[in-house]
């Protein structure tokens, strides 16, 4: 069978080849001119063409069939000249047949269309109805709103009309009162001016009479002139007299007479009235002041002040009055006047505090800049480079305990050196600071004589110790200094490790030591307490490693850290004056690294580190945290507990040291005053529970326990009695030192203080009280605790003033002219401004005047002028309420 090509197919169906190729391509068949066409491809093309020209069902049968019929015939038509003409007529007919299913679909589509149109019509009608209803509802709401607005407007208009009527009535009454007052003022003014005129005339006549007498005395010399002017003298024309005094007096009288009519026409302006600078007839430059028009008694004397250039006034903690005046560019007398108006008397050389100086400067219209005296000190100490991260450091351990219980021997065995043998009598005579390298790490030890240095440093605010090791001899047990060491450690809040020493002795009884210490709240861990007990023998070295492990374990719990890099800071452990080397200070570095050549500020002393030695006397170049070193090069001997800080600038360090020396006396006085029983209330911190620290000594143990129990029962939620130390026997120096460090009072029951303790108490200005009756002791402590209770306050209204008028003052702003309706208005009390019985401002009075005078108070029924500080929105009808805050003293229930 011959293959049918695309070209042959195009010729067969009468379609151009390009069109046929395009149709094949549309049908998804790619062909060229010479490609053959299979029967299936022809069917695919046919189906594609049918789909393109009309929809087909799944069987490809058409739903619509169109038949075209064409018939040709010849028609004879008569032409011109009687001839007929044959015309070819072709009739074309076209008829379309549609399947029944297609008709049904068309009907169904038409029906759906009709239903959709009907539904749309119904929806449109419903929407129109809803819109009409909403429109009607909106119109009704708008109508109701308009009616309500009209009603409210009518009500407001009626109220405004009533208010205007009341205001007009009040205005008429006020106008009438003002006219009456004005009339009275004019009458008073006329009387005053008439009186002034009479006085001036009398004075002028007196001067003229004196001039006449002078002329008569010099009659011989002026005889010729007197004869020429005798006629003028008879007519009382005194201008021609030769006396300069007479001419001046007459000129002054004439000027006053000429100025009288003009003065009556002018209003009184007290702030602007000034005396004339001489007249045209004055001679010799001697000016006579003209009559100054004084304000009447019906006017308030708020004068317009001269404009003063505002200054930025820097005020320290104290300032001399003359220095304050100089900074404000005014005379010192002006400052004293302002202070007198404020109720403070001062002289030109008097020193006033910062708060008073601030009030005076603000009163005179200047801007105040408050300066701290220690700004330089803060700037120097804050200029430090300690940005490095904190790292772990070695613990600082203080060895404490009773005399000869083995403190130095324990430390000596650890250091592997015989320090104790070199001491006088085997007792430690000076403070030693050492650091030792153990297998488990480094530890720094402070060996103190008893606990004096520990307490002295804590009294100065230095917290150099991390852990306290309490050495107790197993054969002696708890001794007085052991108890004091426990009290000091607890007061400092430092963890305590007990080293029970001398367990190698035959009469050693460690269990007895535990029982005795348990009475002072030192409970072993095996008994459920928090204190570690280590049994050691300093002489034989028994269990020394166990003590070191306990120290390092406690330091791990504390998580001790310090900055290793950067500028160093530390605390002075001990200091002395060496004969050959000058001031020598033992410094415990707490953070940073101390290098040779650094500039160090130690309390009131400063200097460059010329040399550094460790505890063995070896020269070193630097020392890190927890390392004790001896430094040389300070300007003087610092005190134990002073903070040692490395600074950048030696000049600023010298300035800070000089400033601290100047303030030392004030600081000492303040420190002496803080332990007074009467000052306990001032030492309270707001929001914290107040503590009354007590050191209690009695004659017998029973009294100590009874008094301590009674004092503890006095504690409340607000005030707590804290017994920092107690014991049997007289009051010793250690008791006084503990009281000074703990800010405590000393109570002695049937005991007395020895000479050394009395000297310490006197130097520290501590509060020492003796008692022989227990109830008297309890009552006085109870009264002191009552004084430490936070007071209660209530407000009492003492006066009420009604604002009748408002004036404007260039200096004070809005001034309220008031009538005191209730109580008394006092200048020094706080006030409230009420409008329609609602508080709109709370503040204080800036000015209170009665007529032109400043007054301290105005009583009921009198008028006054009130200036409210920092508030100018005072209106007529306002009320100014003056109240005072009354303190209600509280007592213990």
Swiss-Prot record:
Tell me which residues make up the tr-type G domain. 392-561
**Region G5: start and end of each range?**
537-539
Which protein is depicted? Translation initiation factor IF-2
Predominant place of localization = cytoplasm
Q: Protein biosynthesis: present as a keyword of the record?
A: yes
Residue ranges, annotated region (G3): 447-450
The record's listing under Gene3D superfamilies reads: P-loop containing nucleotide triphosphate hydrolases, Putative DNA-binding domain, N-terminal subdomain of bacterial translation initiation factor IF2, Translation factors, Translation initiation factor IF- 2, domain 3
Please give the family membership noted in the entry.
Belongs to the TRAFAC class translation factor GTPase superfamily. Classic translation factor GTPase family. IF-2 subfamily.
Is Thylakoid among this UniProt entry's keywords? Answer: no
Q: Where is this region: G1?
A: 401-408
Lineage here is:
Bacteria, Pseudomonadati, Pseudomonadota, Gammaproteobacteria, Vibrionales
The region called G4 is annotated at 501-504
Membrane spanning stretches: none
Could you tell me which Pfam families the record lists for this protein?
A: EF-G_D2, GTP_EFTU, GTP_EFTU_D2, IF-2, IF2_assoc, IF2_N
The record's region (Disordered) falls at: 51-203, 216-299
Instruction: Map out region (G2) in residue numbers.
Output: 426-430
What is the documented function of this protein? Answer: One of the essential components for the initiation of protein synthesis. Protects formylmethionyl-tRNA from spontaneous hydrolysis and promotes its binding to the 30S ribosomal subunits. Also involved in the hydrolysis of GTP during the formation of the 70S ribosomal complex.
Q: Where does GTP bind?
A: 401-408, 447-451, 501-504
Q: Where is the composition biased (Basic and acidic residues)?
A: 102-203, 216-238, 245-261
User: Cellular location of this protein?
Assistant: Cytoplasm
Where is the secretion signal located? Answer: none
Keyword annotations for this protein, in alphabetical order, are: Cytoplasm, GTP-binding, Initiation factor, Nucleotide-binding, Protein biosynthesis
Any one Gene Ontology cellular component term annotated for this protein = cytosol
What highest taxon heads this organism's lineage? Bacteria
The Swiss-Prot or TrEMBL record annotates one GO molecular function as:
GTPase activity
């Amino acid at each position: 069978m011959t293959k049918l090509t695309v070209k042959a197919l195009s010729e067969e169906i009468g379609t151009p080849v390009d069109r046929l190729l395009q149709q094949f391509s549309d049908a998804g068949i790619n062909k060229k001119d010479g490609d053959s066409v299979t029967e299936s491809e022809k069917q695919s093309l046919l189906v594609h063409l049918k789909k393109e020209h009309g929809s087909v069902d799944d069987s490809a049968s058409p739903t619509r069939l169109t038949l075209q019929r064409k018939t040709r015939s010849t028609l004879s038509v008569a032409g011109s000249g009687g001839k007929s003409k044959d015309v070819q007529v072709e009739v074309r007919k076209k008829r379309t047949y549609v399947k029944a299913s297609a008709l049904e679909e068309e009907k169904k589509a038409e029906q759906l269309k009709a239903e959709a149109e009907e539904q749309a019509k119904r929806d449109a009608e419903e929407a129109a109805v809803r819109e009409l209803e909403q429109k009607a509802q909106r119109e009704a709401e708008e109508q109701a709103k308009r009616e309500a607005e009209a009603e409210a407007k009518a009500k407001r208009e009626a109220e405004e009309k009533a208010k205007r009527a009341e205001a007009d009535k009040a205005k008429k009454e006020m106008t009438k009162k003002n006219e009456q007052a004005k009339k009275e003022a004019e009458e008073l003014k006329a009387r005053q001016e008439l009186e002034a005129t009479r006085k001036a005339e009398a004075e002028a006549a007196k001067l003229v009479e004196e001039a006449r007498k002078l002329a008569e005395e010099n009659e011989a010399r002026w005889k010729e002139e007197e004869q020429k002017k005798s006629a003028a003298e008879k007519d009382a024309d005194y201008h021609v007299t030769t006396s300069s005094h007479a001419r001046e007096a007459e000129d002054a009288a004439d000027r006053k007479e000429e100025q009288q009519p003009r003065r009556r026409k002018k209003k009184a302006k007290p702030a602007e009235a000034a005396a004339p600078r001489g007249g045209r007839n004055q001679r010799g430059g001697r000016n006579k002041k003209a009559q100054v028009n004084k304000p009447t008694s019906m006017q308030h004397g708020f004068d317009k002040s001269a404009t003063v250039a505002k200054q930025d006034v820097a005020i320290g903690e104290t300032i001399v009055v003359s220095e304050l005046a100089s900074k404000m560019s005014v005379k010192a007398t002006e400052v004293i006047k302002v202070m007198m108006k404020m109720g403070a008397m001062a002289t030109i050389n008097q020193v006033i505090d910062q708060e008073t100086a601030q009030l005076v400067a603000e009163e005179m219209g200047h801007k105040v800049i408050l300066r701290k005296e220690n700004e330089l000190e803060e700037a120097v100490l804050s200029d430090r480079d300690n940005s490095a991260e904190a790292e772990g450091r070695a613990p600082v351990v203080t060895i404490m305990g009773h005399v000869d219980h083995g403190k130095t021997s324990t430390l000596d065995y650890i250091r592997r050196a015989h320090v104790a043998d070199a001491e006088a009598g085997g007792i430690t005579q000076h403070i030693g600071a050492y650091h030792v390298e153990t297998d488990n790490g480094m530890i720094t030890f402070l060996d103190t004589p008893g606990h004096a240095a520990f307490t002295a440093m804590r009294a100065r605010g230095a917290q150099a110790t991390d852990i306290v090791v309490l050495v107790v001899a197993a054969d002696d047990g708890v001794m007085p200094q052991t108890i004091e060491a426990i009290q000091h450690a607890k007061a400092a809040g430092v963890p305590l490790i007990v080293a029970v020493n001398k367990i190698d002795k035959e009469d050693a009884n460690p269990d007895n030591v535990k029982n005795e210490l348990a009475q002072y709240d030192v409970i072993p861990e095996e008994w459920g307490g928090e204190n570690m007990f280590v049994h050691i023998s300093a002489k034989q070295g028994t269990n020394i490693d166990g003590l070191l492990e306990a120290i390092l374990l406690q330091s791990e719990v504390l998580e001790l850290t310090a900055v290793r890099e950067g500028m160093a800071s530390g605390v002075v452990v001990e200091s002395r004056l060496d004969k050959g080397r000058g001031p020598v200070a033992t410094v415990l570095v707490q953070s940073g690294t101390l290098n040779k050549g650094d500039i160090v500020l130690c309390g009131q002393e400063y200097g460059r580190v010329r040399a550094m030695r460790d505890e063995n006397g070896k020269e070193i170049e630097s020392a890190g945290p927890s390392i004790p070193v001896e430094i040389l090069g300070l300007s003087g001997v610092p005190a134990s507990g002073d903070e040692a800080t490395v600074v950048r600038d030696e000049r600023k360090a010298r300035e800070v040291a000089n400033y601290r020396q100047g303030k030392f006396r004030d600081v000492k006085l303040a420190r002496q005053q803080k332990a007074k029983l009467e000052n306990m209330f001032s030492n309270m911190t707001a929001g914290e529970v107040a503590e009354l620290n007590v050191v209690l000594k009695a004659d017998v143990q029973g009294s100590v326990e009874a008094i301590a129990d009674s004092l503890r029962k006095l504690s409340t939620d607000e005030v707590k009695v804290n017994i920092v130390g107690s014991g049997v026997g007289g009051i010793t120096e250690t008791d006084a030192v503990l009281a000074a460090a703990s800010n405590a009072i000393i109570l002695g029951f049937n005991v007395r203080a020895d000479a050394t303790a009395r000297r310490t108490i006197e130097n520290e200005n501590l509060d020492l009280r003796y008692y022989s009756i227990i109830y008297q002791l309890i009552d006085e402590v109870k009264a002191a605790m009552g004084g430490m209770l936070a007071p209660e306050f209530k407000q009492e209204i003492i006066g009420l003033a009604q604002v009748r008028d408002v004036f404007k003052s260039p200096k004070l702003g809005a001034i309220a002219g008031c009538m005191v309706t209730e109580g008394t208005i006092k200048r020094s009390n706080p006030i409230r401004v009420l409008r329609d019985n609602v508080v709109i401002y709370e503040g204080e009075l800036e000015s209170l005047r009665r007529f032109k005078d400043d007054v301290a108070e105005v009583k009921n029924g009198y008028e006054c002028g009130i200036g409210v500080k920092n508030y100018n929105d005072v209106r007529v009808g306002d009320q100014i309420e003056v109240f005072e805050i009354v303190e209600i003293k509280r007592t213990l229930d």
